[in-house]
């Protein structure tokens, strides 16, 4: 058989990977390549969502040379306008992306304005990303409301001053201040309503020139009626001359009400004082009756005590009269072994033995005498 040589097949050339020197170098180089690939992958990932960039979702470069997804930048701009790495303002190099970011911010501002205008209570946001435009709009609306309240308060103050001047200028009182008719109250309400409407139609603060009285013609435009009070004829413009005849009647009505209230209060005070006096008299009468009853009871008690004393005295006299017979009865009773003595209403029985030969002691009566 022929000899086959395998030297060519098993010859390890310098470029063969099975060479130990070359194998070690190739493994180290592959490790470096993998590490560099990992670094590139981390560098090519978005810092907000930590996901790599793809062809469908490419990276968007900012002015600070940081790359993010466009959607991540839009979502981040809802919270802050600064870069999350270097804290600089978001400025995109791509003009189309920058326009899209600006449009999103404008839309967000419009939504916040609509929400703040629709809700009656202002919403306090917890974030610090308030824009100057939003703050200016809020301050302007607050200023408008404040000025509106001020103008309304000034208008009301002018109305009150004008009404007080009309009431204080008149010093005419009604003919009978103690009586108030329902028609007077109706006229008062009518006057107040008409004056309020006229003041609303006129300027809130009248000028001094408009307050000057105009000449009045011979025919009076306000006829007086005994039953209905005063009637007001409608005029084209409210003036001081047309309102001056109203003021005496308008002022006389409050004065009449005050006088009526004063008279009623005086009557109430008198009735209260009279009722107090009646109560005091009743209490005194009851006390006198009780005293008389107590005196009668004392008299009866004294009479009873006197009767009892007389009865006791009679008993004493009767015991004195029958003193001898009582002694005889006691001597006879000793023979049988018992001794009876009478002392008022009390009877004492004492037994004594005859064998000892004791002598009977004389018993004392209530009056202090011995029998």
Curated annotation (Swiss-Prot):
Low complexity bias spans: 226-252
Keyword Heme set for record: no
Pathway info: Protein modification; protein ubiquitination
Enzyme class: transferase
Zinc finger extent (RING-type): 46-87
UniProt-recorded Gene Ontology molecular function terms: ubiquitin-protein transferase activity; zinc ion binding
Stored InterPro entries: Znf_RING, Znf_RING/FYVE/PHD
BP GO annotations: megagametogenesis; microgametogenesis; proteasomal protein catabolic process; protein ubiquitination; regulation of cell cycle
Function description: E3 ubiquitin-protein ligase involved in the positive regulation of the gametogenesis progression. Mediates the proteasomal degradation of KRP6, a cyclin-dependent kinase inhibitor which accumulates during meiosis and blocks the progression of subsequent mitoses during gametophyte development. Functions in association with RHF2A. Possesses E3 ubiquitin-protein ligase activity when associated with the E2 enzyme UBC8 in vitro.
Protein name: E3 ubiquitin-protein ligase RHF1A
Taxon lineage: Eukaryota, Viridiplantae, Streptophyta, Embryophyta, Tracheophyta
């Amino acid at each position: 058989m022929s000899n086959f040589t395998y030297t060519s097949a098993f010859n390890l050339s310098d470029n063969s990977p099975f060479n130990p020197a070359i194998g070690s170098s190739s493994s180290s180089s592959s490790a470096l390549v993998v590490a560099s690939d990992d670094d590139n992958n981390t560098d090519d990932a978005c810092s907000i969502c930590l996901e790599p960039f793809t062809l469908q979702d490419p990276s968007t470069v900012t002015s600070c040379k940081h790359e993010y997804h466009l959607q991540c930048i839009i979502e981040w701009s809802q919270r802050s306008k600064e870069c999350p790495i270097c804290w600089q303002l978001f400025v995109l190099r791509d003009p189309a992306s920058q326009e899209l970011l600006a449009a999103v911010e404008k839309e967000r501002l419009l939504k916040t304005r609509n929400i703040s205008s629709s809700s009656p209570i202002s919403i306090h946001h917890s974030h610090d990303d308030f824009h100057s435009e939003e703050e200016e709009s809020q301050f302007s609306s607050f200023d408008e409301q404040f000025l509106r309240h001020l103008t309304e308060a000034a208008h009301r103050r002018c109305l009150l001053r004008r009404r007080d001047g009309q009431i204080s200028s008149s010093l005419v009182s009604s003919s009978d201040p103690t009586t108030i008719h329902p028609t007077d109250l109706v006229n008062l309400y009518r006057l107040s309503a008409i004056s309020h409407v006229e003041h609303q139609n006129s300027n809130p603060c009248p000028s001094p020139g408009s307050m000057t009285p105009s000449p009045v013609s011979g025919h009076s435009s306000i006829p007086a009626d005994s039953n209905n009070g005063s009637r007001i004829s409608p005029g084209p413009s409210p003036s001081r001359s047309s309102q001056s005849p109203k003021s005496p009647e308008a002022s006389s009505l409050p004065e009449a009400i005050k006088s009526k209230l004063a008279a009623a209060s005086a009557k109430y005070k008198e009735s209260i004082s009279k009722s107090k006096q009646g109560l005091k008299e009743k209490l005194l009468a009851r006390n006198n009756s009780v005293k008389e009853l107590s005196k009668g009871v004392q008299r009866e008690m004294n009479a009873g005590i006197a009767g009892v004393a007389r009865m006791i005295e009679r008993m004493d006299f009767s015991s004195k009269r029958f003193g001898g017979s009582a002694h005889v009865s006691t001597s006879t009773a000793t023979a049988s072994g018992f001794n009876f003595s009478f002392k008022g209403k009390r009877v004492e029985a004492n037994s004594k033995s005859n064998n000892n030969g004791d002598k009977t002691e004389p018993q004392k009566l209530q009056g202090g005498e011995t029998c």
